[in-house]
A protein has these predicted regions:
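Surface-exposed loop/turn segments and immediately adjacent short secondary-structure elements
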Residues: 6, 10-22, 31, 35, ...
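Basic, alpha-helical interaction scaffolds
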Residues: 7-53, 512-585, 634, 638, ...
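Conserved pre-catalytic core of RNA-dependent polymerases
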Residues: 174-175, 182, 202, 206-431
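Arg/Lys-enriched, amphipathic patches
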Residues: 1-168, 206, 210
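Short helix-interrupting loop/turn segments at helix-coil junctions
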Residues: 53-63, 110-122, 151-156, 185-195, ...
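Catalytic palm subdomain of template-directed nucleic-acid polymerases
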Residues: 359-376, 412-413, 455-485, 500-503, ...
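Short, conserved micro-motifs composed of acidic
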Residues: 401, 488-518, 619-625
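Short, conserved catalytic/metal-binding micro-motifs enriched in Asp/Glu and His
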Residues: 23, 27, 111, 182, ...
C-alpha cells in the first residue's frame, strides 16, 4: 500500500475517518448476536477486512514494485511524460511536433528532477537507518542496508535441485521442493530422553490480566515501519497511522483472545521468503528463510514479551549477554580478550571451547520449552497463550509469486516471532545451569574461590577452563544435557583454543575430536591466542574495503551531495571498519593503517587528489571527522563508562579488575 501518501494531512485524516467508520460499524455488528462476533476468530476476520478495505480505498497499491524508493508523485510524472511522448509520435506536421517536443522536454525535466529528489531522500533515509544499525551493533542489518544502497541484490536461481541432485525446472516442482526443504529444516528430530523439569514453587510477578490500552499503544509505537505484512496483508503503518482507532479495535480483540486462550488461525501461519547466501544457488541449503507473520499478532507478542522480560530477566545468569538490555557483544569480546591477555601475563593455562549448535533455534523441543518456562516462574496463563500460538503453526513458501502447500512446524521457536529470542535464552540458561551445577570446572575469577565457567551470547557459548580434564568433563556434560532439550552440538563448527597447556590431548565429543585453532572469529571479532588484535584489525580493513567497493555507484553518483555520501560512508563503511574497536589493543602502526584507509576513501568521496595539497587535518575538517586514534579512544572510554556504571555483578566490570 502507498503509505507515503499519509504524509499528506488531508489523506491521513480521510484514512482515519474511514477506519473509524468501519470500526464503528464493526462495533455495532458486535452488539447483534446473530452476527456471531462473540468469538475471537469471527471478530478478527471482520477487523482484518476493515483494515484492508481502508488501505485499499484511500491509499491504493504501489505501481513500481522493483524500485520502492520512487514516490507516487514521480510515477505520475513518468506517466504524464509517456502521454506527451505519444502526442509527439502522433504529430502530423513539423510545427505540431516541435510544439509537442517542447512540452515533452519540460515533462522529461520534471520527471528526472522528481526521481533525483526521490533518490536523494532514499539515500538519506538509508544513511539514517545505517547509523541506527551501527549504533546498535547490528552488523547483519547494516550489511543488508549496504546491499540495498549498492543495488546489487543476488538474483535467485530459477531452477533448483531435488534431493537426488536433479534440476527442477517447473514452478510447481520447485515450490514442492522448497516446501519439502523447509519442512525438514524446521522439524528437527525429538530428543531421545526428555528431562524432568519441576515447575517453580512460586510464579514470578507477571500480570495475567488482559492487555491494557496503554500496553497496546506502546507496542504499536514499537513496530518498525517499512516491514512486510504477514498473511493478513496488514502492514505496520496501517496500525501506526490510526493509533487510537487500532488501539480500540485490538483491545476488544485481545480481550476475546484472553478469555478463550487462543489466537486466530491466520496468526499461526507464516510466509517464508527465501534470501540467497553464498555458494551454488541451485542448492536449497544456500538460502535462508525469513518468516512473515501477522503484524497485529506481533503487537500481542510484544506485550507478552515486555511482561516476561521485566520479571524474568534477573533470573538469567550474568554470563548471558544475548538479547538483553544494556549488554552487548563488546562486553563478551572485551572480557575474553582480558582473560587471554592476563593468562599470558601470569603464565596461566587456559582452554576456551567455542560451542556451535546445529540449527539451534529450530531444534528445541517445545514440550521441554513449556516446562522450562514454568520452571522459571512464568504463570500458567501466559504459558498457555504462548503455547496455543504454536499449536497448529504452519508455513508456506513464497516462490515465483505463488505460495507452496502449507506444512506444519512442530519444533523450535517460530521464526520472526518476537518471543523466540527470549524463550531461547531461558533454554540455554537452564542448560548451562545444569552443566555447571555443583561443579568447579571454570577459571578462577576471584580471591574467594569464585569461578567463571562460560561466556554466552545467545547460542554462542565460550566454555572456560584451566585444565584439560575440566574442559573435557564440561564439554561432555553440555553435549548430554543440551541433547535432552533438542540442541545438538555441531562438531564441524565448534573449535577449541588452548594456551600454556601441558596436556596435548584433544577435546572430544561423542561424534569425534574437536578441531584446535590458534584464532577464532568470536561474535564478529578475531580473537587470537597471542592476545593481540592485529588479526582482527586486518580482518576489519578487508571487510570495510569490500563494503566501500560495493557502494561504488554511490560515490560516483552526481545526484547525491557530498554531505550525504559522507553520512553513508560513516554509517556503512566506517562502522564496519571500527566494529569492536573498543576492544582493540592498538599501537601507532595499527592506528596508522586504519587512518590511511579512512583518509584514502574520504579523498575519493570529496574529489581531492594529491595535487590539491590538502592536509589530513583539513580533510578531516571538511568531512566532519576526528582522527581514527581519537575516535577509537572515545569508543573505549564510552564503553568503560557504560560498564563501570553497571552493578557489581557485571562480568565485564569484574573483568576490568581481574588479574
Amino acid at each position: 500500500f502507498l503509505f507515503a501518501e499519509v504524509t499528506n494531512e488531508q489523506i491521513a485524516e480521510t484514512f482515519r475517518i474511514l477506519l473509524t467508520n468501519k470500526f464503528q460499524a464493526l462495533s455495532d455488528l458486535g452488539r447483534d448476536q446473530e452476527n456471531n462476533l462473540d468469538t475471537y476468530e469471527h471478530f478478527w476476520e471482520k477487523s482484518k477486512t476493515a483494515w484492508n478495505g481502508a488501505c485499499e480505498e484511500v491509499l491504493g497499491r504501489r505501481k513500481c514494485q522493483d524500485k520502492p524508493w520512487i514516490s507516487e508523485n514521480s510515477i505520475k510524472k513518468i506517466e504524464e511524460r509517456k502521454k506527451v511522448k505519444e502526442t509527439v509520435n502522433r504529430a502530423k506536421t513539423r510545427q505540431q511536433k516541435q510544439a509537442a517536443q517542447q512540452i515533452y522536454h519540460e515533462a522529461h525535466k520534471e520527471a528526472r528532477t522528481s526521481i533525483r529528489n526521490d533518490k536523494r531522500a532514499y539515500a538519506e533515509e538509508m544513511a539514517r537507518m545505517g547509523e541506527e544499525a551501527a549504533a546498535k551493533g547490528n552488523m547483519r542489518e547494516l550489511y543488508e542496508i549496504t546491499r540495498k544502497l549498492a543495488g546489487k541484490w543476488k538474483a535467485t536461481s530459477g531452477s533448483i535441485r531435488d534431493q537426488a541432485g536433479s534440476l527442477l525446472t517447473t514452478q510447481q516442482d520447485q515450490a514442492k521442493r522448497w516446501a519439502e526443504y523447509f519442512e525438514t529444516l524446521l522439524n528437527q528430530p525429538p530428543p531421545t530422553g526428555k528431562p524432568n523439569i519441576p515447575a517453580a514453587t512460586e510464579d514470578l510477578d507477571i500480570s495475567c490480566d488482559k492487555p491494557t490500552r496503554a500496553e497496546i499503544k506502546k507496542a504499536i509505537k514499537a513496530l518498525k515501519s517499512g516491514k512486510s505484512a504477514g498473511p493478513d496483508n496488514i502492514p505496520p503503518e496501517a496500525l501506526k497511522h490510526s493509533m487510537e482507532e487500532s488501539t480500540e479495535l485490538l483491545h476488544s480483540l485481545f480481550e476475546k483472545i484472553w478469555q478463550e486462550g487462543d489466537v486466530p488461525k491466520e496468526w499461526k501461519e507464516g510466509y517464508i521468503v527465501k534470501i540467497p547466501k553464498k555458494g551454488d544457488l541451485h542448492e536449497c541449503s544456500n538460502y535462508r528463510g525469513i518468516s512473515l507473520l501477522s503484524v497485529p499478532g506481533k503487537v500481542l507478542n510484544r506485550i507478552i514479551l515486555e511482561r516476561i522480560t521485566l520479571a524474568a530477566d534477573h533470573r538469567l545468569t550474568e554470563q548471558q549477554a544475548g538479547f538483553r538490555k544494556h549488554r552487548s557483544c563488546s562486553d563478551q569480546i572485551t572480557t575474553l580478550r582480558i582473560i587471554i591477555e592476563q593468562s599470558r601475563e601470569w603464565n596461566s593455562s587456559l582452554y576456551v571451547n567455542f560451542i556451535d549448535f546445529e540449527k539451534a533455534f529450530d531444534s528445541i523441543d517445545r514440550e521441554v520449552l513449556w516446562a522450562i518456562m514454568r520452571h522459571y516462574g512464568i504463570p500458567e496463563k501466559i504459558v498457555s497463550i504462548i503455547k496455543n500460538t504454536y499449536v497448529g503453526a504452519t508455513c508456506r513458501v513464497i516462490h515465483g509469486g505463488q505460495l507452496s502447500e502449507p506444512f506444519e512446524v512442530k519444533t523450535g521457536g517460530r521464526q520472526g516471532c518476537l518471543l523466540t529470542p527470549f524463550l531461547f535464552l531461558m533454554v540455554v540458561d537452564w542448560v548451562m545451569r545444569k552443566v555447571t551445577e555443583g561443579k568447579k570446572t571454570g577459571i578462577q575469577w576471584s580471591l574467594w574461590g569464585e569461578q567463571l565457567e562460560d561466556l554466552d551470547f545467545a547460542d554462542d557459548l565460550a566454555l572456560l577452563s584451566h585444565t584439560h580434564q575440566h574442559m573435557q568433563e564440561k564439554t561432555r556434560r553440555l553435549e548430554q544435557i543440551a541433547a535432552t532439550t533438542g540442541l545438538r552440538i555441531n562438531r564441524a563448527k565448534t573449535k577449541v583454543m588452548r594456551m600454556i597447556c601441558k596436556s596435548t590431548q584433544p577435546i572430544t565429543l561423542n561424534t569425534g575430536i574437536i578441531e584446535e585453532v590458534s584464532s577464532f572469529t568470536y561474535l564478529g571479532s578475531v580473537v587470537s591466542i597471542d592476545g593481540g588484535t592485529e588479526a582482527d584489525i586486518k580482518a576489519r580493513l578487508n571487510k570495510a574495503t569490500v563494503a566501500f567497493r560495493m557502494l561504488d555507484n554511490i560515490w560516483k553518483a552526481k545526484s547525491l551531495s557530498k554531505r550525504t555520501k559522507i553520512r553513508i560512508f560513516n554509517s556503512n563503511v566506517k562502522s564496519v571498519l571500527l566494529y569492536g574497536s573498543e576492544t582493540w589493543r592498538t599501537t601507532k602502526a595499527l592506528s596508522k593503517k586504519v587512518q590511511v584507509f579512512i583518509n584514502k576513501r574520504l579523498r575519493r568521496i570529496l574529489g581531492i587528489n594529491w595535487q590539491d595539497r590538502v592536509t589530513n587535518e583539513e580533510l578531516w575538517a571538511r568531512a566532519g571527522q576526528n582522527s581514527a586514534e581519537d575516535t577509537i579512544r572515545g569508543r573505549k572510554w564510552t564503553w568503560i563508562g557504560h560498564t563501570i556504571r553497571r552493578g557489581q555483578g557485571c562480568i565485564a566490570r569484574q573483568a576490568l579488575k581481574w588479574t
